[in-house]
Amino acid sequence: MVVLKYFFVILVNFSFTASIGHAYFQARLPKEVFDVQEPSSRIEGEPGSMSYRVRDCRKVSVTNLRRRIVNTSIQEWAYFGFEIYDLTDTRDDNPNYKREPWRRPVVDSAEALRVADSIAGYWSSTPDSAWILERQNQSWNLRGGDSRWRNPWSAAFVSWVMCESGLGDFNRFQRSVAHYSYIDQAIMSRATANSVSAFVAFDVGEKLIEPGDLLCRGSRPEYQTLAERRSQIGVGARTHCDIVIKLDSDKKRILLIGGNVRAWVRLKILPADFSNQGFLVPVPYNGRRLFAHLKLQADEVENGVFENSPSVQNLLCGGYDFYLPGIIDENSVKCVLQVKD
């Protein structure tokens, strides 16, 4: 597996900022370019005394729901410094890959402080999470404001993205501190007539995967199929889901963005192959298997939605000298005027 950090040379645009940790991140775009309420704006106070200022979701048009989910995820990835977690060489059928022992990720202290209120903002979108923030405040007071988060925040990240994308109604998306809550909602929606759930659950390979969909795995238990989870619906489980950003058929890989991926918001690259139906589907990797495909019930978008996103357009067309090999081909990207969604 490869964890990559890309560095950017700053030219004339102030939407990039250099952190003390020497990684460059892209500030969130002005609202007139992309109208997203920053997660940090939902928080009051400093590490050790943070509290929620906003808990609900504002009303956002869902006309371009799939595109907005993708664009919102990409903007957060940019704010966290364009970190990449490449797992393509860890596919289980790679004879040259040897699984490495797990090591706790190390986050730069200055960077941890910079994004603390953003992660707290993700938590604010989930119900019954006040105790988590209070626990974190206690940890910060004891260990310092740059100490790691005590609770995994990947489900909070997904919940905030959906909240900010217009899925504030719990009947549409069950925002939660744990992924299994909205996985179960998507499972039940498939068997429920007239369900208004934004996602419907399928086994991986059963349906075409598109940008804006969710792909999920289980670690405790290690679910292999959707039926295994269906038999335990409502029971707590340690699961993880990421948001699909791009299907790369030429290189047989799927690009996703998730929270708390190695303690950060990262772009994850998974190995893939074509199914018998001709779909590009993820293959087992690093001893893991995805068991659920949560398909978004929304209009399709072009597969180039990644390159066309406001954050990537700002990177490619904003006058920067950048280095992002193997992810974006700048020669194939057209600079277009972005309209606020």
Question: What annotation goes with each model-predicted range?
Answer:
Residues 79, 161-164, 168, 221-223, ...:
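Short loop/turn segments at secondary-structure transitions that flank enzyme active sites
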Residues 25-170, 314-341:
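N-terminal capping segments
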Residues 7-15:
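Bacterial N-terminal signal peptides
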Residues 18-23:
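Sec/Tat signal peptide C-region and signal peptidase I cleavage site
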Residues 260-341:
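Low-complexity, Gly/Ser/Thr/Pro-rich intrinsically disordered linker/tail segments
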